C-alpha cells in the first residue's frame, strides 16, 4: 500500500514537473515573440517592435493560413508563428514568369512579426517582400532562395534570374534575426546550359533598396549562394538612397558565399562580430570578395573573422585586399578583425579611404578570437533562438 502511494506521488510529481517545464517554455517563447530590436540601426527612428502590441499570436503551417494571417495590407499589429514548413507555391509548380511573379511574392504589412517555432519555420519556392512599409521583424526562419523558372537573357551578361529570398524595398525599421537563407536543395552546380551559356536561376539572398533605412541583420546565416546581399540597387538611384540605407550586421555567418556580403551603393554599413568562411577554389561557390564598395557606399568593419582558403594577390596587392572589392568607392575602415586567425592591419594598404562614422546607438564589438568565431558560427541561424 505504501509503495503504491509512493509510486503515485512520484508519478504526480513527474507530471507536475513536465507541465511546469512546458508552461515555462511557452512563457519564455511568448516573451521572444514580443521582443523588440535592441541593437544597431533598427533601434533608431522610434525603434522596431514588429507586432509586439498584438492581442495574441496566430499559428500557421501552410501558405493559405499564412496569407490569411497577413491579411493583405492590414497594418494592425500581428504576430505570426510558423509551426510547419510553408511551400509558397502551394505545391503547384510555376509555369511562367508572370505566374511566378503573381504567386511567389508574399508582401508583409507594417507592424508584423513573423517568427518560426523551433526548427519548423521554413519557407520554400517564394519570397518574403517587405515593401513600402515599416516596423517588421523576421525571426527564427529558414528561407530557401527561389528558383526562377524563366530567366531572362541579357546580351553580354548571359542568363539572369529574378526573385530574391527576402526583399526590403522602400521600408524602414526592419529587424532580421536568427534567419538562415540558403540555396538549399537547388545549388548552383545543378544549373544547366542554354544556348551555350550557364542557365542562371538564382538572384539574391537579400536585397535592401529604394530608400530603405534603419535595418539590423543579426545572428543570421547566409550560406551556399553567389550574389548574396545587395544594398542599393542602382548607381542612378542616389536621389532616393543618399543618406539612407543604414544597416547594421552583427553576429552573422557567411558560409560558402561567393560575393556581396554585402555590396553597397549609397548606404552606410556597420559590420561587427561576423564570421566569413570561404575558399577561392570551392567547386560551386568560389570566394571572390566579402565587402563590395559601390557608388557612394561606405563600410565600417570591426572585429570580424575571415577564414578564407587560397587567397591570392590581385593587381600586386596583399591577398587580404581581395576581401574588399572597390567598384566606385574606397570608403572603408577595419579594426580588430582576424584573417585566417591573425590580426590584420593589411587592409590599410589596399588604397582605401578611412571611414569613421559617428553612430547614434550603443554597441559592444567583442574582441575577435577563434573561440568567439566558433561560438558565433554555432549560434547563428534558425533553430538557435
From Swiss-Prot:
Localization annotation: Secreted
UniProt KW keywords: Calcium, Lyase, Metal-binding, Repeat, Secreted, Signal
Extent of the signal sequence: 1-30
Binding residues for Ca(2+): 164, 207
CC cofactor: Ca(2+)
Note: Pectate lyases have been implicated as pathogenicity factors which induce maceration or rotting of plant tissue. PelE is sufficient to induce these effects under laboratory conditions.
Name by which UniProt lists this protein: Pectate lyase E
Amino acid at each position: 500500500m505504501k509503495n503504491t502511494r509512493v509510486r503515485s506521488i512520484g508519478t504526480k510529481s513527474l507530471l507536475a514537473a513536465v507541465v511546469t517545464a512546458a508552461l515555462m517554455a511557452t512563457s519564455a517563447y511568448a516573451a521572444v515573440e514580443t521582443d523588440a530590436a535592441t541593437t544597431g540601426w533598427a533601434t533608431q527612428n522610434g525603434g522596431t517592435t514588429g507586432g509586439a502590441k498584438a492581442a495574441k499570436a496566430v499559428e500557421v503551417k501552410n501558405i493559405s493560413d499564412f496569407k490569411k494571417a497577413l491579411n493583405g495590407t492590414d497594418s494592425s499589429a500581428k504576430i505570426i508563428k510558423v509551426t510547419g514548413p510553408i511551400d509558397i507555391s502551394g505545391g503547384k509548380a510555376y509555369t511562367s514568369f508572370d505566374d511566378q511573379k503573381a504567386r511567389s511574392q508574399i508582401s508583409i504589412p507594417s507592424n508584423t512579426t513573423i517568427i518560426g517555432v523551433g526548427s519548423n519555420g521554413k519557407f520554400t519556392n517564394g519570397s518574403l517582400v517587405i515593401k513600402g512599409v515599416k516596423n517588421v521583424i523576421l525571426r527564427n526562419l529558414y528561407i530557401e532562395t527561389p528558383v526562377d523558372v524563366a530567366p531572362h537573357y541579357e546580351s553580354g551578361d548571359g542568363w539572369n534570374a529574378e526573385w530574391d529570398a527576402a526583399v526590403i524595398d522602400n521600408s524602414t525599421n526592419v529587424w532580421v534575426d536568427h534567419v538562415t537563407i540558403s540555396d538549399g536543395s537547388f545549388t548552383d552546380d545543378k544549373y544547366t546550359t542554354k544556348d551555350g551559356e550557364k542557365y542562371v536561376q538564382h538572384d539574391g539572398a537579400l536585397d535592401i533598396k529604394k530608400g530603405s533605412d534603419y535595418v539590423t541583420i543579426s545572428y543570421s546565416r547566409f550560406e551556399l549562394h553567389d550574389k548574396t546581399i545587395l544594398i542599393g540597387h542602382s548607381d542612378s538611384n542616389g536621389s532616393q538612397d543618399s543618406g539612407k540605407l543604414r544597416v547594421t550586421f552583427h553576429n552573422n555567418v557567411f558560409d560558402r558565399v561567393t560575393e556581396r556580403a554585402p555590396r553597397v551603393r549609397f548606404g552606410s554599413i556597420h559590420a561587427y562580430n561576423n564570421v566569413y568562411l570561404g575558399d577561392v577554389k570551392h567547386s560551386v561557390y568560389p570566394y571572390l570578395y566579402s565587402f563590395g564598395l559601390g557608388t557612394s557606399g561606405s563600410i565600417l568593419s570591426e572585429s570580424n573573422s575571415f577564414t578564407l582558403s587560397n587567397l591570392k594577390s590581385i593587381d600586386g596587392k596583399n591577398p587580404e585586399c581581395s576581401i574588399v572589392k572597390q567598384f566606385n568607392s574606397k570608403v572603408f575602415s577595419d579594426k580588430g578583425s582576424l584573417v585566417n586567425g591573425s590580426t590584420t592591419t593589411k587592409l590599410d594598404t589596399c588604397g582605401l579611404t578611412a571611414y569613421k562614422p559617428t553612430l547614434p546607438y550603443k554597441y559592444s564589438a567583442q574582441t575577435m578570437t577563434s573561440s568567439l568565431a566558433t561560438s558565433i558560427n554555432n549560434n547563428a541561424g534558425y533553430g538557435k533562438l
